[in-house]
Amino acid sequence: MRAVLQRVTRATCTVEGRVTGATGPGLLILLGVAPEDTPETAWRLAAKIVKLRVFADETGRMNRSVQDIGGGILSISQFTLYADTRRGNRPGFSGAAAPEHARALYAEFNAALRAQGVAVGEGVFGAHMMLDLTNDGPVTLFLDTAES
């Protein structure tokens, strides 16, 4: 799995004019799923993300997690994180999981986040989504479970 995390003051996902998910202060997560990913991968990544200390403490140092601040998460499925741009000018996506597999693991990932007490808003899997967010920092991190 690959995840792009952005620390946000707010984020909203809209599909066809309808808000499907939102968060106040917290994280926006763009999640990509690979064919070899499993439910265990989803739970491990979720556990890592909710404990990452990317929010400022009283001294201004990044020392608090999304759990610590009582923040929320907006989780968005994004197969394009597995784009291969090495050849030509059109990205290939053969490194991304098949839609059925990715949909199941996206749901598992969101369940794992919720199981750790974090409020989670969601996008709509496979839909064309409009994201509106305010980055905080900005702080943007890239996590890849294949590298852990």
Swiss-Prot record:
Compartments, as annotated in UniProt: Cytoplasm
Disulfide bonds: none
InterPro entries: Daa-tRNA_deacyls_DTD (IPR003732), DTD-like_sf (IPR023509)
Keyword tRNA-binding in record: yes
Reaction catalysed by this enzyme: glycyl-tRNA(Ala) + H2O = tRNA(Ala) + glycine + H(+); a D-aminoacyl-tRNA + H2O = a tRNA + a D-alpha-amino acid + H(+)
EC number: 3.1.1.96
Enzyme class: hydrolase
UniProt motif Gly-cisPro motif, important for rejection of L-amino acids: location: 137-138
Family in the record: Belongs to the DTD family.
Function of the protein: An aminoacyl-tRNA editing enzyme that deacylates mischarged D-aminoacyl-tRNAs. Also deacylates mischarged glycyl-tRNA(Ala), protecting cells against glycine mischarging by AlaRS. Acts via tRNA-based rather than protein-based catalysis; rejects L-amino acids rather than detecting D-amino acids in the active site. By recycling D-aminoacyl-tRNA to D-amino acids and free tRNA molecules, this enzyme counteracts the toxicity associated with the formation of D-aminoacyl-tRNA entities in vivo and helps enforce protein L-homochirality.
Assembly mode: Homodimer.
Protein name per Swiss-Prot or TrEMBL: D-aminoacyl-tRNA deacylase
Species of the source: Deinococcus geothermalis (strain DSM 11300 / CIP 105573 / AG-3a)
Name of the encoding gene: dtd
